[in-house]
Amino acid sequence: MKRLSLVTTNRLSPQGNFLPLCTFPLAVDMAALFQEASSCPVCSDYLEKPMSLECGCTVCLKCINSLQKEPHGEDLLCCCCSMVSQRNKIRPNRQLERLVSHIKELEPKLKKILQMNPRMRKFQVDMTLDADTANNFLLISDDLRSVRSGLITQNRQDLAERFDVSVCILGSPRFTCGRHYWEVDVGTSTEWDLGVCRESVHCKGKIQLTTELGFWTVSLRDGSRLSASTVPLTFLLVDRKLQRVGIFLDMGMQNVSFFDAESGSHVYTFRSVSAEEPLRPFLAPSIPPNGDQGVLSICPLMNSGTTDAPVRPGEAK
């Protein structure tokens, strides 16, 4: 079995004011700009006493030594653009330091703006697992809603759409348009991958979860390291361990957002998600013996809200 490769709060209130779904992408863009401007590319935390390199990039003062080309040397290699700066030519960036201070003050408001809108659940999909795509080491429940990794191959039929090396599975239905929402219970699992992918992704051989290859996923490793499948990886910070993940796909706006479905907190949003071909739900549980054999379960429908009519695999687009 092969591990998938990764390339290197307040509760919801029905009476609260939530961001309209149509303006959510704009808020995400704003939050992303704030995060990019205030984050250190070395430690991924807020910039602390930011120092500007000769190339114009900025890092924390405490992270400067990690850029040394040689121990105790004066040359600093930028981790963003690979340009070399002289230690005696770096300067404090006071203006950016003040900006970061303001952004830290605004963080609670940004979190509230990006909180999950309960109306997203109107678009909940009656989803099942597509057994024809399942890797042979995956054990699937009879109702096609839960999956975990096993130690013994299931000797399923060798199909063109089946993942033969990477231990993962696709969900059904496929999506060609509209808005769609679903939740996955990850329980206490310490490793998992969830999201969407192009229907045409390569399923033979070891796969890499990257947006460039058609995977828009959030992954958990070692019980605490959460990341998005951007290139390079975007490491994510959450207030608490995720146990139920909400995924909202908006084909029209070309974005997919991830939430802590229990608290409503925003986790991450991919923008510019390709809508040129159908997308499929993607799931990958942990792998024993290093993994914990955690179960991923698709949560049942919570209401009978309307959804855009999905297209099942094999049906005409």
From Swiss-Prot:
SMART domains: PRY (SM00589), SPRY (SM00449)
GO cellular component, one term: nucleus
Tissues where the protein occurs: Expressed during neurogenesis in differentiating human embryonic stem cells and in the developing human neocortex.
Disulfide bonds, paired cysteine numbers: none
GO terms for biological process, alphabetical: innate immune response; regulation of gene expression
Location relative to the cell: Cytoplasm; Nucleus
Keywords associated with the record: Cytoplasm, Host-virus interaction, Metal-binding, Nucleus, Zinc, Zinc-finger
Zinc fingers (RING-type), renumbered ranges: 40-82
GO molecular function, one term: zinc ion binding
Keyword Nucleus: yes
Record Pfam families: PRY, RDM, SPRY, zf-C3HC4_4
First and last residue of the signal peptide: none
Keyword Metal-binding part of the UniProt annotation: yes
SUPFAM superfamilies: Concanavalin A-like lectins/glucanases, RING/U-box
Domain B30.2/SPRY: 107-301
Functional summary from the UniProt entry: (Microbial infection) Stimulates the activity of Human Immunodeficiency Virus 1/HIV-1 pre-integration complex.
Annotated protein name in UniProt: Ret finger protein-like 3
Organism the protein comes from: Homo sapiens (Human)
